[in-house]
Regions:
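Glycan-recognition and catalytic cores of secretory/periplasmic carbohydrate-active enzymes
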Residues: 2-557
């Protein structure tokens, strides 16, 4: 049964009254009337002041936002961020806009007309897509961020194609968006770096337009993800949309050229943004490559970004190897010729070329650069890609002119590469050539196999002709460049744009491919235009071209 009794407190009950309250009451009763009035007045005054203070404070509190304290924390954070931004801003390299004139001779006019023809076709049938398919007149998608636009905008600017440049600039400002437009798949980190980041960096240096720097930073932050490996060497592929990095599906290795041909771009991004993180990644990856053991400066074409070890034994200045060696010299130039390790590694690899890869082909006695299989067996195969080495050696000679063998080798290799063009009925080189090294055999000096007979509108020989002409002042290199340009016009020009071709050996049926490479506009036509100028628009002590022909400044340190 529940207890229904309740405890009741009677405050009138003297048993429950505090002795203190009783004594206080007696004290109050003993005071004179005036004393009591004075105390009451004091109490009322204090009460009035208290109420006024509370109402004033409440009014002030009404004006404060609900997240007042969060804002105070945010202010502290913003102050720290402002300090960091101010530090970054102070580190930024100042860029001065360059102005280019119109073409100055018939050769340059012809090249600019070719550029306008290629651009018009892309603008008509593939605007905003990565590349044009000129036979079907349809666009093709690769990265999803306007590859042709970004890759060749500096070419448009250098050729003073104002209307076309303005269209390209507007697209980059309003439509270049890795979140919204990039394709949801893994693509080459290397290609995106040299073509798209390189293009943005270059056009920023030429114009000083901050929109290009903004886009470069947006892209660079994504590309930085790939360097997050145990060694610091970048993974081979990146999904721009997902901000995810990956190695190849078919191997855990990356190509030598891919891990060794991103340093110019990342370092330059730090110099113009003021944020050191990109250059730190470039330097760490460069250090890993420098510290590996080499065979007279030569290394295999595959390396693991997970442990930094080379695999296989193929040594090549063609596909998967070429631009690693190219960037050794160019990083030395970019850093004000202050970091001797780059020069030392480069000059050592040239010694390795002379010892292991440099051969004479018969009966025409043409020097070429072959390949090593398993680090020992020589192969008389040379990719057209390897023709870059002629200009690279000439460039190295321009800084150390006592090393005359560099210029001699550059001249010999340039001649051989031009023969790869001149000996074909179309006047265009195949992608790969084989050379006869046996003086006793009665065969052609250069042979082309069926699978290697295509031409992709590549720039490597034109690039070397550009260096050779301005370093020797020998007009033969301009003449060779003009001959090649005329062959491009005759055999690769389509009603809309230009196309790669499948067979340089058959001038009656070159079998066009439905593809116009972005590097034809970004590199081949740019180098042709520069070759035909009367002065070098990019002095070699002040500028260095990345492997996609995007000019970047050579810094003093």
């Amino acid at each position: 049964m529940k207890n229904t009794n309740h405890y009741v407190v009677n405050f009138d009950d003297k048993l429950h009254t505090s002795p203190y309250s009783i004594s206080l009451y007696r004290y109050w009763r003993q005071l004179h009337r005036q004393q009591r009035l004075f105390i009451i007045a004091i109490v009322l005054l204090c009460l009035f002041i208290y109420i006024g203070y509370r109402s004033h404070g409440a009014e002030k509190m009404k004006k404060l936002p609900e997240d007042y304290h969060r804002q105070e924390v945010a202010k502290d954070k913003q102050a720290w961020q402002r300090k960091k931004i101010e530090q970054i801003e102070s580190n930024k390299v100042k860029v001065q806009k360059r102005i280019f004139s119109n073409p100055i001779n018939e050769h340059q006019i012809a090249v600019r007309d070719a550029m306008r023809h290629a651009w018009k076709a892309y603008r008509t049938y593939a605007w905003g897509y990565d590349e044009l398919q000129p036979i079907s007149k349809t666009p093709s998608m690769w990265f999803g961020i306007g590859l042709t636009i970004v890759d060749c905008i500096d070419t448009l600017y250098i050729m003073n194609m104002t209307e076309e440049y303005n269209d390209a600039r507007e697209w980059i400002a309003t439509s270049f968006d890795c979140d919204a437009n990039s394709v949801d798949k893994f693509n080459s980190h290397f290609e995106i770096t040299i073509r798209i980041l390189g293009g943005l960096l270059s056009i920023y240096h030429l114009t000083g337009d901050e929109i290009f720097l903004k886009r470069a930073v947006e892209l660079g932050d994504r590309l930085l993800i790939n360097f997050n490996t145990p060694t610091g060497l970048p993974l081979a592929e990146i999904n721009l949309k997902r901000k995810a990095a990956s190695g190849y599906r078919w191997t855990s290795d990356s190509a030598l050229s891919e891990v060794g041909t991103v340093q110019l771009e990342m370092r330059d991004l730090s110099r113009i943004s003021g944020d050191q993180k990109y250059e730190n990644a470039a330097d760490k990856s460069a250090a890993v490559l420098h510290n590996q053991s080499k065979k007279d400066g030569l290394v295999p074409i595959f390396i693991s970004p997970l442990n930094g070890r080379f695999s296989g034994g193929v040594v090549s200045f063609g596909a998967r190897g070429d631009s690693y060696y190219e960037y050794l010299l160019k990083q030395w130039v970019q850093t004000g010729k202050q970091r001797s390790v780059f020069w030392d590694d480069w000059i050592e690899c040239i010694g390795g070329v002379r010892k292991h890869l440099w051969r004479l082909a018969y009966p025409e006695k043409l020097y070429f650069v072959g390949e090593l299989m398993s680090l020992s067996t020589f192969s008389p195969k040379m990719d057209h890609l390897a023709c870059f080495l002629a200009g690279n050696m000439a460039l190295g000679w321009s800084y150390q002119r006592n090393l005359t063998y560099l210029l001699d080798m550059a001249k010999d290799l340039t001649k051989t590469c031009y023969k790869m063009y001149a000996k074909q009925p179309t006047g265009l080189s195949s992608e790969i050539a084989y050379f006869n090294t046996d003086a006793q055999l009665n065969v052609e000096t250069i042979t082309v196999r069926d699978n290697d007979a295509h031409n992709l509108l590549r720039p490597e020989l034109i690039e070397s002709l550009y260096y050779m002409y301005f370093l020797t002042n020998d007009k033969i290199y301009q003449d060779w460049g003009w001959n090649i340009f005329q062959s491009f016009e005759k055999y690769t020009r389509q009603t809309d744009g230009y196309s790669s071709i499948n067979d340089v050996r058959n001038k009656d049926n070159v079998r066009p491919r439905d593809k116009m490479e972005s590097f034809f506009l970004a590199e081949t036509l740019k180098y042709l235009y520069l070759l035909f100028d009367t002065q070098n628009l990019f002095p070699y002590d002040e500028w260095v071209f990345n492997t996609e022909a995007h000019p970047l400044p050579a810094y003093k340190n």
